[in-house]
Every structure is written in C-alpha cells, then in structure tokens.
Amino acid sequence: MKRQKRDKLQRAHTKGFNAALQGQSKENCPFEELNAREEWLGGWREGREAFTTNGMKAYI
C-alpha cells in the first residue's frame, strides 16, 4: 500500500500553530516559500489566539 504524503501547506499551518503555543516569535518562521510562509503565519496567529484565550496570558 502506497503511503500518501501530507499536504505541505497543512503541515506548515500545524507547525505555526504549535510554535505559537510554545510562545515562539513569528520571526522564527522556518519557511522560505511564500505560500508555506503564509500558512505558517496563519497557524501562528490561530495558535497565539488560542494561547491567550486559554488563560495562558501569564506566559507571554
């Protein structure tokens, strides 16, 4: 059975979300390609929102 590769943009989004939950800066985006970078930043924004709304404001 052939394994299917994960969508690169979905992976970038997830990595950005997780980076925000860990309190990393958006300047730490590891992607050079524009589309992947935009997805990473979108995930980062969502993660930052989740980070602040879940009562974790003290760690920012």
Swiss-Prot record:
It is found in: Cytoplasm. The keyword Cytoplasm applies. One of its GO terms (biological process) is regulation of translation. Its main location: cytoplasm. The keyword Lyase does not apply. Gene3D superfamilies: ribosome modulation factor like domain. Belongs to the ribosome modulation factor family. This is Ribosome modulation factor. It comes from Kangiella koreensis (strain DSM 16069 / JCM 12317 / KCTC 12182 / SW-125).
